[in-house]
Swiss-Prot record:
Record protein name field: Occlusion-derived virus envelope protein E66
Keywords on record: Membrane, Viral envelope protein, Virion
Statement: the UniProt record of this protein carries the keyword Membrane: yes
GO CC annotations on file: membrane; viral envelope; virion membrane
SUPFAM superfamilies xrefs: Chondroitin AC/alginate lyase (SSF48230)
């Protein structure tokens, strides 16, 4: 019978107990065998790692030369990752250190040293050393290291007792460590070493899988779609920490999923939903929008490109506000904002990426190099409006001892897609960045067009803000000569930045170059005057094109008839109560009838659509490019994006939205 039926007997026979023990041992042996056979494959899927380590072991009690792991949490994390990397080398047949006796002894001695330096019992609401924010090294990285080393050394040294003791103390439950309860992505990582510890205790996989907290984690990795909260949402965007588009957590946990399938059944993980989720944000090169990756500021994952086969095309998450395009020439992705979706999440050590997450507007050309951000450069990226600090990233600290998410105080966003083009427009107010703006982004065959309109500083500024158009990292890409002359047509690393004026509107500032030696970057920028931004009239307009296609681009931007503008009463627009009453009033208005739509001249939206614009002053514009895109009266769930009108060489974007669905 099942283990459950056996365990309910008052006094199991010696034979049944022996059978249970044998079954449990088989589960442990099978798991360790599978783990060893797939070690290199799974390690290659692991985002956080030190691959092919060469750091010298030491005999001074610190495990590795140059590290102080028993006092420095950063060094401790480096030590754990290095041990994992050496364990992989030890079990990789093609590696020079394959089954090396000296390496085996050093790995064994390192775990023994770890055991004698850790406090037992584990601290509560505090890391063993360092700040509270350093918990991650001890709750996630360390148990993975202990598991990895114990399995790698099987047949050479037996670390079972030490591994059991460490995991028991620091992972007493799959969702609990150091006195803190963990959920979602963290729990996915913690649960696997916990299950291994239970196998070392002699439990079977079936018995482990029946534990309530393990069942909770298995429920998470089943990846059912959810309407709100943690998990894969109905539009396939992944959320963690309730309101954060935290695909990085999913990426960091991806390597564990096959282990769960091996232990608990091949259908534990819903790979279809997982595929759609990864496809929404990723690319074959591993690039992704920074807001969908880690809090330390990143546009590249060294494993994301290896998870699935990415198809070219355009995909969007209507309610989570994500738009992604993949073409043979470039990858593009932009995120919008919604009232209950965090535009930024900070922790005690990562607090300078708010602008990067909220305002990155760029393309990643297929033939361009990818340079990940340095700590000094996180605040400088294409699309970022510099309105608080011109020379270094803006710091927006966490409000707790752990992570804090930040929501926009006003947000409306809508997106529309075809097979070869995508558009996103939004109005957003970001208190922590002292900004409110309207944003219009169009991805087409040749690259990206972008317009910021009605840019406003919430608190007046005394300097001229500017929008970053292109960035040259002079440290990581020092082989490319420094920029010396500004131009309204500037090419760098496969991307050509192109300046646009708007017909029937005041000319915009020419691009200018700014060099920041202390940061190690040069920026191509478009300046907006302080007077304009203080008055809420700042404008920036440019294209980022694949360099090989730039010469054939014929984009022009046209400000339409003034009668297409509609403004709200200023007092009503700037007050929360007025905004709410306005939105309620708009919901009562009737949508334009099909008859009204049929009899409207091409290029002009029905008047009743204009009256439903919740954005206040909304700048319709026409984008002429060599694109063949067809999308009429696009409807994305409850979001209405009217008059994405297409002719052979003309895409007229007249983005008029109802309030229904714009915020969510």
């Amino acid at each position: 019978g099942s283990f459950a039926s056996v365990s309910q007997r008052a006094e199991p026979t010696a034979a049944s107990a022996a059978a249970i023990a044998e079954l449990a041992n088989l589960d442990l042996d099978d798991f360790e065998r599978y783990y060893t056979l797939t070690l290199l494959e799974k390690f290659n899927q692991k985002a956080e790692k030190i691959a092919n380590p060469t750091r010298q072991f030491s005999q001074d009690g610190n495990v590795f030369a140059g590290l102080s792991p028993w006092s420095s949490p950063v060094d401790f994390g480096t030590c754990m990752h290095t041990l994992i990397g050496y364990g992989v080398r030890f079990r990789t047949p093609a590696d020079a250190l394959y089954l090396n006796d000296e390496l085996a002894f050093n790995l064994y001695a390192a775990i023994v040293e770890l055991y004698y330096n850790l406090p037992f019992p584990a601290p509560v609401n505090q890391a063993p050393w360092g700040a509270q924010a350093d918990w991650y090294h001890f709750s996630i990285t360390m148990p993975e290291c202990v598991q990895n080393t114990c399995i790698a050394l099987r047949g050479f040294y037996d670390l079972s007792d030490i591994a059991r003791a460490i995991i028991d103390a620091y992972l007493p439950a799959p969702t609990f460590s150091l006195g803190w309860q963990r959920t979602a992505g963290n729990a996915m990582r913690m649960c696997l070493p916990y299950c291994y510890g239970q196998l070392l205790h002699g439990l079977s996989a079936a018995e482990i899988g029946a534990q309530p907290e393990v069942r909770y984690v298995l429920g998470l990795i089943a990846f059912p779609r959810v309407a709100t909260g943690n998990g894969i949402h109905m539009d396939f965007a992944y959320f963690d920490h309730t309101d954060v588009r935290a695909t990085a957590y999913l990426i960091n946990s991806y390597f564990t999923f096959s282990y769960y399938n091996f232990l608990f059944g091949s259908h534990v993980v819903n790979m279809d939903n997982l595929y759609r989720c990864i496809s929404l944000v990723g690319s074959a090169r591993g690039t992704a929008h920074p807001a969908l990756l880690s809090r330390n500021g990143s546009q590249f994952s060294n494993v994301l490109g290896h998870f699935i086969a990415y198809a070219d095309g355009v995909v969007s998450a209507d309610f989570s506000k994500i738009l992604t395009i993949r073409t043979p020439r470039y990858f593009g992705s932009v995120v919008g904002q919604a009232p209950n979706v965090a535009y930024y999440e900070a922790d005690p050590t990562n607090n300078t990426h708010a602008a990067l997450w909220a305002m990155t507007r760029k393309i990643w050309p297929a033939d361009g190099a990818v340079f990940n951000y340095r700590a000094q450069t996180v605040g400088f990226e294409s699309g970022v409006i510099l309105a608080s600090n011109l020379n270094e990233p803006v710091v927006v600290p966490t409000t707790t001892t752990s992570t804090s998410s930040f929501l926009p105080s006003l947000a409306h966003t809508a997106a529309a897609t075809t097979q070869s083009a995508g558009a996103m427009c939004m109005r957003v107010r970001l208190e922590e960045l002292n900004l409110e703006f309207y944003s219009y982004t169009l991805y087409h065959a040749g690259g990206m067009f972008h317009l910021y309109d009605n840019v406003k500083a919430l608190a007046p500024v005394s300097f001229n803000p500017r929008c970053v158009v292109l960035v040259h990292d002079t440290v990581q890409n020092s082989s490319v000569p420094a920029w010396s002359v500004a131009s309204n047509l500037k090419t760098y690393n496969g991307t050509t930045a192109k300046h646009h004026n708007i017909t029937n509107a005041s000319s915009l500032a020419n691009f200018s170059i700014r060099t920041l030696p202390a940061v190690g970057v040069q920026t191509l920028e478009q300046i907006m005057s302080a007077d304009a931004v203080n008055a809420g009239l700042g404008v920036s307009c440019f294209s980022l094109l694949v360099a090989s296609e730039a010469a054939t681009d014929t984009t022009s931007v046209i400000k339409m008839d003034v009668n297409t503008f509609r403004d709200l009463d200023a007092k009503q627009r700037d007050s929360a109560g007025g905004e709410l009453s306005h939105r309620r009033a708009q919901r009562r208005q009737l949508s334009p009838t099909d008859d009204q739509r049929r009899h409207q001249p091409l290029g002009r939206p029905p008047h009743s659509i204009l009256r439903q614009d919740p954005f206040g002053p909304l700048l319709p514009f026409a984008h002429r490019a060599q694109s063949q895109v067809g999308l009429h009266y696009a409807r994305r769930r409850r979001v209405r994006l009217r008059q994405l009108r297409v002719q052979s060489v003309s895409i007229q974007l007249l983005m008029m939205m109802t309030t229904q669905g714009c915020g969510r």
